[in-house]
Amino acid sequence: MNESKLTFNLELDENNVPKKIIMNSSDNQAKDVSLKSVMIAAWDETTKETLRVDLWTKDMMVNEMFIMYHQTLISMANTLSKSTGQDKLAGALRDYCEFFAQETKIIQSNQD
């Protein structure tokens, strides 16, 4: 059986806020990748709940967070469509992504 390990090393400040996040993988697909943020969601099959780890460094700007959220939501819509065939629900999520992007001003409105 093949195995691969993904690790995140954190350098914390005196208040335990991440100053640095470094990602590595045992298969060398990721080697010392410097991250400003990481969001991990995992499904606990026993409790039927999503477990979450959300970390970001002090130097991550709000606009960068908006872009990350937008890209994550788009990816979730694509995965929803691909994995379940629920294109209508995925489309609704994409519509929300458009609204989110306009409200956060990470993209220009077609009406501007």
Functional labels for PLM-detected ranges:
Residues E3, L12, Q108-D112:
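Short hydrophobic/aromatic patches at helix-to-coil boundaries
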Residues M1-F8, K31:
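Structured beta-strand/loop patches that form or line metal/cofactor-binding pockets in enzymes
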Residues L6-S25:
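Active-site and channel-lining beta-strand-loop segments
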Residues N16, M60-I67, R94-K105:
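Short alpha-helical interface elements
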Residues N78-D112:
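C-terminal charged interaction modules
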Residues K19-G85:
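Active-site- and interface-proximal helix/loop "cap" or "latch" segments in soluble metabolic
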